[in-house]
């Protein structure tokens, strides 16, 4: 139990033991529609810029998107349970990467990396 006091006011806050972990991972699977090939860091930079443009620096820090892998014009973005919705909302905002036209289409969200790999065609 945590106790905060401010002069005459006292606030009691109980920690809930069975509360779900808010840092649980989520994996967003997306399609890359483009004639060109891109590196992982180029796509990650574009995703981070679009999240920052849509939600600001706070949502960028909360969601912390990372592109894990790309395979056959499909990719996986790792994020947490708090920020996966802003990533899904910001993917269609990406129109160009390195002055080449591209469209990123979110397909599915899953909770395990193994399932995400299976959905993009690995294993």
UniProtKB/Swiss-Prot annotation:
GO molecular function terms listed in the Swiss-Prot or TrEMBL record: ribonuclease P activity
Enzyme class: hydrolase
GO cellular component, one term: cytoplasm
Signal peptide (from-to): none
EC annotation from Swiss-Prot or TrEMBL: 3.1.26.5
Keyword Zinc-finger on entry: no
Family annotation (InterPro entries): Pop5/Rpp14/Rnp2-like, Rnp2-like_sf
Main location as per UniProt: cytoplasm
Reactions the enzyme catalyzes: Endonucleolytic cleavage of RNA, removing 5'-extranucleotides from tRNA precursor
Biological processes per GO annotation: tRNA 5'-leader removal
Keyword field: Cytoplasm, Endonuclease, Hydrolase, Nuclease, tRNA processing
Subcellular location(s) of the protein: Cytoplasm
Family: Belongs to the eukaryotic/archaeal RNase P protein component 2 family.
Free-text function comment from the UniProt entry: Part of ribonuclease P, a protein complex that generates mature tRNA molecules by cleaving their 5'-ends.
Complex and partners: Consists of a catalytic RNA component and at least 4-5 protein subunits.
Annotated protein name in UniProt: Ribonuclease P protein component 2
Gene: rnp2
């Amino acid at each position: 139990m945590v106790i905060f006091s401010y002069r005459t006011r006292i606030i009691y806050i109980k920690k809930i033991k069975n509360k779900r972990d808010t840092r649980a991972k989520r994996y967003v699977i997306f399609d890359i529609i483009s004639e060109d090939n891109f590196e992982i860091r180029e796509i990650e930079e574009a995703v981070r810029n679009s999240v920052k443009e849509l939600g600001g620096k706070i949502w960028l820090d909360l969601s912390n998107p990372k592109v894990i892998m790309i395979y056959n014009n499909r990719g996986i973005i790792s994020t947490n349970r708090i920020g996966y919705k802003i990533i899904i909302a910001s993917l269609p905002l990406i129109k160009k990467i390195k002055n080449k036209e591209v469209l990123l289409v979110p397909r599915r969200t899953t909770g395990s990396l193994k399932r995400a790999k299976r959905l993009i065609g690995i294993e």
